[in-house]
């Protein structure tokens, strides 16, 4: 694991590194399922989309979640309605920058959840 410079937010840095590692694992796993990578960590006003991929002709916005155990609920349960709204807003803005919209682009919202060693792929987990 990379060294975190002194004086930096060590907890935040480690969380970012952990998140990046799980997002990379999700990307590789989804590519193995036939999806094609478009973008990672797409930041838009009000939110960030972990992965954007294509499944055939469908643009897929993917939220990646990890929990060490299901003690407080599995990873998928951590995608709250508020988080869903932020993702919808970010996706709408991202599509707009690509000259698209929910009306013109076939898209869906998936969640890839890692709980311990288990992976769960929730296709069409939520929508607008």
From Swiss-Prot:
GO terms for molecular function: nucleic acid binding. Gene3D superfamilies: 3.40.1350.10. It comes from the Bacteria. SUPFAM superfamilies: Restriction endonuclease-like (SSF52980). Residues 1-20 are annotated as: Disordered. It holds the Pfam family UPF0102. Transmembrane segments: none annotated. Belongs to the UPF0102 family. This is UPF0102 protein KPN78578_35270. It comes from Klebsiella pneumoniae subsp. pneumoniae (strain ATCC 700721 / MGH 78578). The lineage of its organism: Bacteria, Pseudomonadati, Pseudomonadota, Gammaproteobacteria, Enterobacterales.
């Amino acid at each position: 694991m990379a060294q975190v410079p002194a004086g930096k937010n060590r907890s935040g840095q480690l969380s970012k590194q952990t998140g990046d590692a799980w997002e990379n694992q999700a990307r590789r796993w989804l590519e193995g399922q036939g999806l094609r990578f478009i973008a990672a960590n797409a930041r838009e006003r009000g939110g960030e989309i972990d992965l954007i991929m294509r499944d055939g002709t469908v643009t897929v916005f993917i939220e990646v979640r990890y929990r060490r155990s299901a003690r407080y609920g599995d990873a998928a349960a951590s995608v709250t309605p508020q988080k869903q709204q932020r993702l919808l807003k970010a996706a709408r803005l991202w599509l707009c920058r690509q000259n698209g919209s929910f009306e013109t682009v076939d898209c869906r919202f998936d969640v890839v959840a890692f709980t311990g060693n288990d992976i769960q792929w929730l296709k069409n987990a939520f929508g607008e």
